[in-house]
Amino acid sequence: MSAQSLTHDARRILLAQALRALAYGFGSVLLGVTLDERGYSSTEAGLIIAAVLAGTVLASMAVGRYADRLGRRRCYAILYVVLAGVGVAFAASHTVWLLIAFALTGALSTEVVESGPFTSLEQSMLATELSGDARVRGYGAYNAVASAAGSLGALAAGGLSLLHDAWSGAPADGWFFLVFVPVALAGAAVGRSLTDHVEAAPEVRRRREPAQRLGPSRGVIVRLSGLFALDSFGGGFVVQAFIAFWLANRFGASLGTIGVVFFAVGVLQTASFLVAPRLAERFGLLPTMVFTHLPSNLLLAAIAFAPNLATAVALLLARTLLSQMDVPTRQAYVMALVTPAERTPAAAYTNTARYVVRPIGPVLAGAAQSVALGLPFLIAGSIKSVYDLILWRWFSRVEIPSEDATPPPPAPAARGAR
């Protein structure tokens, strides 16, 4: 999907997303290394990262309930302003509970692609741009932009080690969270430049009752939400900030090395997002989701046994090449399974299900590290593999309706379930 085929608002949204992903890619490296540099324990680091994820849940729920009435553009710009404040707090404060409080605002994210309340708003605002056969390609481009910008941010963070080598008086790494301030303010300006076309319909803005409930596709979405929650729970053990922390702690990897690794991760993610639509067109959405995701999770589990940094990085990069192909296909799959009237609540249900369980992972990962430093990788890979197998078992026979067809019947129950 070329930029010329997008509307003015869609291009602006992708620009704002790119700015945010640049900051998140920079921060994902910086956060893990800074937590290690400041001497926080594994438990304290896990609590801070968990607070970031919990804030994602709370802010996403608030956006889902109030953004259409308060104004999507207004909420979008406010989130960017809050992100600027978070940058100041993480640069200036070493107090664990203060960092947790700012993390709970939901403006910070440990991921560059699916980043909580921002993503929820963007999916709503881009919905009119993504329809029919172009949907999966559109989502692929949307995620690729974030991944590419995030990889550049990670590379920039890696360059800080060169700065310290060249300048003995360079400030501590944590102070570079101030980079969030100009980036976030630029994102806010872009958000405010969007037109009224991205807002909800006037009748939606005037109403007082909650958003429409799911209709005939309720059974399908409830099952998918549960499965997506399981996958997200497993992913919470190995968020990017944790991986940076683990590489630094386990192998003594420098900030520069980690930055280069995450840049390579971002490049492979971008390629993955762009290849996924082509695979989906040939093999189908669900086969692409499952049969790229499952091998990636086996590689993830294998990282726990890496004897050295080179092996760990090789496994991580191989896993990354496959692991993100399910993202645009998953987004398109959910939208294809429901009626047009159900798309907004379906997105809200499935996104919230992913976000709400994710904060548990970093806390448990911190505890698991006390048993074995690489144990979170083994746990994550196992949980996410179970998700793939159940997803295929439950949905491999569920047909995707055409745009004009009625919604699918509820997915078959698991064997033995009543």
Where are each of the predicted segments found?
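Helix-loop boundary and gating motifs at the non-cytosolic
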Residues: 3-54, 220-228, 232-263
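Hydrophobic core of transmembrane alpha-helices in multi-pass small-molecule transporters
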Residues: 18, 86, 96-117, 311-325
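Transmembrane alpha-helix termini and helix-breaking/packing motifs in multi-pass membrane transporters
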Residues: 32-33, 37, 151-172, 176, ...
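Central cavity-lining transmembrane alpha-helices of secondary-active solute carriers
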Residues: 47-65, 263-275
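Helix-to-loop junctions at the C-terminal end of transmembrane segments
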Residues: 59-71, 161, 272-285, 369
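Structural signature of the two symmetry-related core transmembrane helices
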Residues: 74-89, 287-302
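Intracellular juxtamembrane helix-capping segments at the cytosolic ends
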Residues: 108-130, 325-338
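C-terminal membrane-cytosol helix-exit motif in multi-pass small-molecule transporters
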Residues: 157, 161, 181-202, 387-395
